[in-house]
């Protein structure tokens, strides 16, 4: 169903190989592994207990937060895996692109790499995928930090997502920017200003703008046509990168994750409203919500502050929540 979403523009601007995206139940996601540079316990084994998997947002990639994960790995003395979702970064292009499929990809990654008691750090799109993974396979995961998202349907964000995708599509299809133009990124930035005035958001999206073929070939993009391109198959992601990202599946009654889950909420963001907090309390009873003075783009606006909050959560905060939950359970039995 999703693979037929091909956007055809006028003949002058068509630069895509006219084939559909393949449909795959799961894909092997590309990843980077961040190990502590100096370990207090000597040489750290590759498969240590309780590694962390960092899960990026829409149009993000494992490269976005390289420095953050290096810092967290050293602060927490544990390996951190950063992944690329399908249709992102270095991972292959394929459909479907929905929460059920992305969650299955994440669970497949954890099981394939034999990760023992991993925890998750999920941001935005990656936050919802992380939450669904906790609910689908609660015994597989130890804990999580969910960054600025909640387990609810969010139709209010669809208009913004449509603008983001339109800006990406029109920049590669209508701006006429050649790959050999040394100012290609600056020109792409200028063109995107027609749709997105915010410099931070443009910078985030432009990390996907390339003038050379990437490591992963795409069945739908001709990277050798002399023009700039996006790493993501944006022309083939109409609707799925909007309605599906704003969606949230129906969770059967009684399903919950009882492990400790931290939620980092931007006070200038609308991604964790009261309906979201109610859903969090129901599905993740052993939670703690942290506020940070930022919009939804917390990781770009408050990098040092959010890294500190995340590190403190995994060092001590989650254990405090576990102790409190155990105390409540004991009192309930009396």
Swiss-Prot record:
SUPFAM superfamilies from the UniProt entry: alpha/beta-Hydrolases (SSF53474)
GO molecular function (one): transferase activity
Pfam families named in the record: Abhydrolase_1
Domain of life (superkingdom): Eukaryota
Function (record text): Alcohol acetyltransferase that catalyzes the synthesis of ethyl acetate from ethanol and acetyl-CoA. Can also function as a thioesterase by hydrolyzing acetyl-CoA in the absence of ethanol, as well as esterase hydrolyzing ethyl acetate.
UniProt GO cellular component terms: mitochondrion
Similarity comment: family membership: Belongs to the AB hydrolase superfamily.
PANTHER family named among the record's database cross-references: PROTEIN ABHD11 (PTHR46118:SF4)
EC id: 2.3.1.268, 3.1.2.1, 3.1.1.-
Record protein name field: Ethanol acetyltransferase 1
């Amino acid at each position: 169903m999703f693979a037929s979403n091909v956007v055809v523009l006028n003949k002058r601007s068509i630069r895509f190989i006219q084939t559909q995206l393949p449909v795959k139940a799961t894909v092997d996601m590309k990843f980077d592994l961040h190990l502590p540079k100096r370990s207090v316990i000597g040489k750290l084994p590759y498969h240590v207990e309780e590694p962390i998997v960092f899960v990026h947002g829409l149009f993000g990639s494992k490269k976005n937060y390289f420095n953050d994960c290096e810092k967290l790995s050293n602060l927490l003395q544990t390996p951190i895996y950063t992944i690329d979702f399908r249709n992102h970064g270095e991972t292959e292009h394929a459909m479907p692109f929905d929460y059920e499929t992305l969650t299955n990809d994440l669970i497949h990654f954890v099981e394939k790499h034999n990760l023992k008691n991993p925890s998750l750090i999920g941001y935005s799109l990656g936050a919802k995928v992380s939450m669904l993974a906790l609910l689908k396979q609660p015994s597989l995961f130890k804990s999580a930090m969910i960054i600025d998202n909640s387990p609810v349907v969010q139709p209010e964000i669809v208009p913004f997502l449509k603008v983001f995708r339109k800006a990406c599509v029109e920049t590669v299809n209508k701006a006429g920017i050649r790959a050999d133009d040394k100012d290609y990124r600056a020109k792409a930035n200028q063109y995107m200003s027609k749709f997105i005035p915010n410099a931070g958001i443009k910078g985030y999206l432009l990390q996907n703008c390339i003038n050379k073929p990437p490591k992963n070939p795409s069945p739908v993009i001709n990277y050798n046509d002399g023009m700039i391109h996006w790493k993501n198959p944006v022309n083939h992601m109409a609707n799925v990168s909007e309605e599906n990202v704003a969606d949230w599946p129906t969770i059967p009654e009684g399903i919950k994750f009882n492990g400790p889950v931290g939620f980092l909420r931007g006070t200038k963001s609308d991604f964790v409203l009261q309906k979201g907090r109610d859903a969090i309390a129901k599905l993740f009873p052993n939670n703690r919500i942290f506020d940070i003075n930022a919009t939804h783009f917390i990781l770009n606006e408050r990098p040092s502050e959010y890294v500190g909050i995340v590190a403190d959560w995994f060092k001590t905060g989650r254990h405090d929540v576990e102790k409190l939950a155990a105390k409540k359970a004991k009192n309930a039995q009396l």
